[in-house]
Swiss-Prot record:
It comes from the Bacteria. One of its GO terms (cellular component) is ribosome. This is Large ribosomal subunit protein uL29. Keywords: Ribonucleoprotein, Ribosomal protein. It comes from Brevundimonas diminuta. Belongs to the universal ribosomal protein uL29 family.
């Protein structure tokens, strides 16, 4: 579903940012 995709994208983006810290 679109909502699931949006959640996946958000989680991926957050993981990237945290990772970079």
């Amino acid at each position: 579903t679109k909502i699931a995709d949006l959640r996946s994208q958000t989680v991926d983006q957050l993981s990237d940012x945290l990772x970079k810290l």
